[in-house]
Amino acid sequence: LDKIYGAVINIAPAVEARLWKGAAFTGQVILPVWNNMVGQMDYVRAGVLTLSQEFGLPGGAFGRVTVGNFTNNRMGADLNLRYATPDDRWMFGVEGGVTGSSTFYEGKWQVSAWKRVSGAAEVRFRERRFNMDFNLGVHRYIYGDYGVRVDCIRHFGRTTAGLYAMYTGGEANGGFH
């Protein structure tokens, strides 16, 4: 290692097109401006390239399936199912996905088999008086580790601020979002 930091400046325009009811295509290209890294950072490359379809389910539940090239060099498929109570105070959800790597090295797009399985079960409580959400989720991450995450989110008009804490792989972490 000859650098104590890595820096990357990219321009990454994206477009989202509604195709039909509930369907969307998202396309992004990443244009490198400057970096002190080696590898894919030197090349024009695909960013997010996804096709998603939202759908309703009996009893007021809803879902979304998404396939394509995601962030963090992942490509695969994701299924998300949610149910919110009629007053929207409670929301319950499950999510599952299968992915492989998607990288761009030496001018070639390289993908692996979709073998990494992830999933989550989540519950959200909305406190209306202070316009806050409290989320609790248990997760299985793509490398097989399990974890729990708690979020406290406050909405101020069009601005949102939150805190989170998580525990996975024997380590605790937290921060702001």
Predicted regions: what is each one?
Residues 26, 36-39, 74-76, 101-105, ...:
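Outer-membrane beta-barrel proteins
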Residues 1-2, 25-35, 58-70, 91-99, ...:
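Transmembrane beta-strand segments that form the barrel wall of outer-membrane beta-barrel proteins
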Residues 69-73, 115:
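Short, well-structured alpha-helical patches and their helix-loop capping segments
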Residues 112-113, 141-145:
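Short amphipathic alpha-helix initiation/capping segments at coil-to-helix junctions
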Residues 1-50, 112:
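Outer-membrane beta-barrel initiation region
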Residues 108-109:
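Short helix-loop boundary/capping segments
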